[in-house]
Regions:
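Surface-exposed, low-hydrophobicity beta-strand/loop segments enriched in small/polar/acidic residues
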Residues: 1-145, 155, 195, 222-247
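Small/polar beta-strand repeat architecture
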Residues: 146-176, 180-227
Length: 247
C-alpha cells in the first residue's frame, strides 16, 4: 500500500533547518486552542530569569504573524475521541517555526492556491492568510479590489467594530479591506472582514480600541497587496490525499 499526502502542521524533515524549531507557552489570554499550521504572534515572556520560551498567541493580523505552529516535537497536545487532532490550550507549550527558518510547513490551502498548481504559477506568487477560514490563500484573492464604499456608522463593542454602509457592500468574511478617514483614527487601517451579518453591515477587529463610535465616517477602499503579503512561498501543492484541520 502506498500513500502520498501532507498533514497540516507537520513540518517536513529537513536536517539543515530543523534546529530552528522554537517552543513557547500559549498565552493566558488565548480563549481557543492552537494546533499545527496556525499563524501566531510571539510575545516577550516577562522578566523571569528562566522563561520557558516565548509567550505565544494566535495572530490577529498580518503584522502580528511571527511564524506558524507545528505538531513536531509537541507531544503534550491533548486529544479526545471527539478530536483526534492534538490541541494546545492556554498555559501549554507549543512548537513553532518563525519566518526565515526555511522550513517547509504544510498548510490548509484555499481553492485559489490549489489552482496555482494547474497553471505553472511562480513559487513567488504573493500569498496572504485567510483568518476566517484558517487557510493560506493568494493575496490577489484575499484583497478587496472594488470601488470605494462610504460607511454610515461604525461602532465598537467587545473588541469588535461593526461598520454599516448605505447600500449592499458585497464583502465576504476573510476579505482584506482598507478603511480611511474615520474618526477616531483607530477605526482606520488595513483590516480583515471577520463576519457579514447583513448585506449592509460587516465586522472587523481594529488594531487598537477606539474611544467610542465613529464621529466622522470612513471610506472602504482597495488594499495594497504588499501590505497583506506573507514572506512565504508555495513550494508544492497536494490535493486529494492530505489531512487538514477543521475546528
Amino acid at each position: 500500500v502506498q500513500s502520498d499526502g501532507f498533514i497540516q502542521g507537520v513540518a517536513l524533515d529537513d536536517p539543515a533547518n530543523r534546529f530552528n524549531l522554537a517552543s513557547g507557552t500559549v498565552s493566558a489570554t488565548e480563549t481557543k486552542p492552537l494546533w499545527g499550521g496556525v499563524p501566531v504572534a510571539e510575545l516577550i515572556p516577562g522578566v523571569s530569569s528562566s522563561p520557558r520560551g516565548s509567550t505565544i498567541r494566535r495572530a490577529l493580523g498580518v503584522a502580528d504573524i511571527e511564524g506558524f505552529t507545528v505538531f513536531n516535537q509537541a507531544h503534550n497536545g491533548l486529544t479526545t475521541p471527539q478530536s483526534p487532532v492534538p490541541l494546545f490550550a492556554s498555559g501549554m507549550s507549543v512548537s513553532f517555526y518563525r519566518f526565515g527558518a526555511n522550513m517547509r510547513i504544510p498548510l490548509k490551502a484555499s481553492p485559489a492556491v490549489i489552482a496555482l498548481g494547474t497553471n505553472n504559477a511562480s513559487v513567488k506568487t504573493a500569498l496572504a492568510w485567510d483568518f476566517v477560514n484558517n487557510q493560506i490563500t493568494t493575496a490577489a484573492d484575499a484583497g478587496y479590489a472594488g470601488a470605494d464604499i462610504a460607511t454610515t456608522a461604525i461602532s465598537f463593542t467587545g473588541g469588535v467594530a461593526t461598520a454599516t454602509t448605505g447600500a449592499a457592500h458585497g464583502l465576504t468574511a476573510g476579505k482584506y479591506i482598507t478603511i480611511s478617514g474615520a474618526v477616531p483614527a483607530a477605526y482606520n487601517g488595513t483590516v480583515v472582514v471577520t463576519s457579514v451579518p447583513t448585506a449592509t453591515t460587516f465586522t472587523y477587529v481594529p488594531a487598537s480600541a477606539p474611544s467610542g463610535a465613529a464621529t466622522t465616517q470612513g471610506t472602504i477602499g482597495a488594499v495594497t497587496l504588499a501590505n497583506i503579503t506573507l514572506p512565504a512561498k508555495v513550494i508544492s501543492i497536494q490535493s486529494g490525499n492530505s489531512k487538514t484541520v477543521s475546528y
